[in-house]
Amino acid sequence: MEKRLYASTPFGDIAYTERGSGPAALFVHGVFLNGNLWRPAIDRLSGVRRCIAVDLMAHGATRTRPDQDLSFDGQAAMLLAFCDALGLDQVDVVSNDSGTAIVQLFAARNPGRIRSLTLTNGDVHDNFPPPAAEPMMVAAKQGLIPEVGQRMLADLEDARAQFAVGYEHPERLSADTLRAYVEPLFSSPERTKEVERFILAIDCRSNVAVEPLLRRLMAPTLVVWGTGDIFFGIEWAHWLRDTIGGARRVIELPDAKLFFPEERPDELAAALREHWQYAECVGAGTAASA
């Protein structure tokens, strides 16, 4: 796993990677992954942005208290504290999977901190947990996450099979990539319990409640959506476009799956470069809700 830095916050020591210079861009992953998801895109973007990829609580190298609130509300509050700790007044935010739900909460409640917003396939409004995630939810409810984790640690092909549904080409995932995702999740019984608590805390009610705030959110917003995702259909990309006040458009990536930011970084990076240039032209530094 790429070497981590740490930001000390009231939520714990939040791990992150940082590359590049310029205005800050904050990249937020989802469940079962970590900031490594964004490495290929950051390779292409570090020349124009200070690219910061955070590890959510219960993921990657982030360290939190055993009683820490790991809900999406808690994660959104952590992002604000994380930005404060790094002295980031405004950020270009990019999200994926459950990170997309978390970022909607963060942006809706803190519009003045958002220079621009880019949302990719993920949890939206009341569409989660999606039916395709039911096996994960059942495993957490039945206390089976430790067993699942140990199988993945012992057999990387089992791990590949677990992640396969999110990738167009899971056969291309290297052993190092799989280890970088799996090992931090199940490195200890304590961390595995955190992962289980994160899953059990998944609840769409807060995201439903912030819809009025999203409608007033005027930060320039781009939606980039893979059409081959079995978790989150393209209709949710259109919902975001039609709901967020500053939303511009939807870019559809044919056949792309949930974790396309890792598999198709050229397309994502090109979309981000254009969107960031647009945001600069319209004075996104002053974007805030009405």
Per-region residue spans from a language model:
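N-terminal cap/lid segment of alpha/beta-hydrolase-fold proteins
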Residues: M1-D13
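Catalytic histidine-centered segment of alpha/beta-hydrolase-like enzymes
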Residues: A256-A269
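Conserved HGGG/HGGXW glycine-rich cap/lid loop of the alpha/beta-hydrolase fold
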Residues: T17-A61
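Short, flexible helix/strand-to-coil boundary loops that buttress conserved ligand/catalytic motifs
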Residues: G20, R39-I42, R63, P130, ...
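Alpha/beta-hydrolase-fold serine-hydrolase catalytic core, especially in secreted/extracellular enzymes
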Residues: A279-A290
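Short, flexible hinge/linker loops that cap or flank conserved catalytic cores
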Residues: S8-P10, R19-G20, L45, R215-L217
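A generic "binding-loop/recognition-motif" signal
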Residues: G12, S21-G22, A256
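Flexible "cap/lid" subdomain of the alpha/beta-hydrolase fold that forms the substrate-access gate
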Residues: G12-I14, V31, I52, H59-D89, ...
